[in-house]
Regions:
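C-terminal "post-core" interaction segments
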Residues: 2-9, 17-193
Length: 193
């Protein structure tokens, strides 16, 4: 749908997304990345020496899209909060080498690690221990303190002004209005020197 509407700006709202599956994040990245990046490494997982292989790469695989489309974006606007974590942060980190990722909102959690599900029906337990660290294609995984907006004008605490705590999609809602201002140029970061 988005490709048929010739979407060239995209706001991804991850403020309440505390993670999920690597495969879902990989698909999302493939749909949003510039088409020139398709087929390239998106990142890799690094496991300890008890896991073989220790390095497991993942790519911007256009085969994942199926009947969908790649939007071929150059810039992605991501709405974040203190609840944005894990796979959501992976999307930010792994797309950064290929496009401009503009963060709007609050500082994210800083969970640059992944877990695996281990179940034992006999013992009636399920565990999800941390088993790997997540890197982007440039070998970066340095977001233990979370991602934060690069420009103070993009720092938005949606709870600080309840009159702007509005339904999703309302253009007066605090984070969305800031993103729209970044897109239309009414809110600009200071000039780079």
């Amino acid at each position: 749908y988005f490709a048929s509407q010739k979407v060239n700006e995209f706001i991804l709202d991850l403020r309440y997304n505390n993670g999920g599956l690597l495969s879902c994040a990989e698909l999302l990245c493939t749909m949003l990345a510039p088409s020139s990046a398709l087929g390239q490494e998106l990142g890799y997982l690094e496991f300890n020496n008890r896991f073989n292989p220790q390095i497991v790469p993942f790519t911007l695989n256009s085969g994942l899209i199926g009947n969908g489309a790649n939007l071929n974006l150059n810039t992605l606007y991501v709405l974040t909060s203190s609840q944005t974590a894990s796979a959501s942060e992976m999307v930010i980190n792994c797309l950064a080498p290929y496009m401009d990722v503009v963060i709007i909102g609050g500082t994210t959690v800083g969970k640059n690690v992944g877990s695996r599900n281990f179940s034992s029906p006999e013992l009636m337990i399920t565990m999800n221990p941390i088993v790997c660290k997540i890197y982007n294609s440039e070998g970066k995984s340095d977001y233990e303190s979370g991602f934060q907006p690069a420009y103070s004008g993009y720092v938005v605490n949606e709870m600080s002004d309840m009159s702007r705590f509005l339904p999703f999609g309302d253009t007066n809602e605090a984070l969305l209005s800031t993103a729209l201002g970044a897109i239309d140029g009414s809110i600009q970061p200071p000039a780079q020197e």
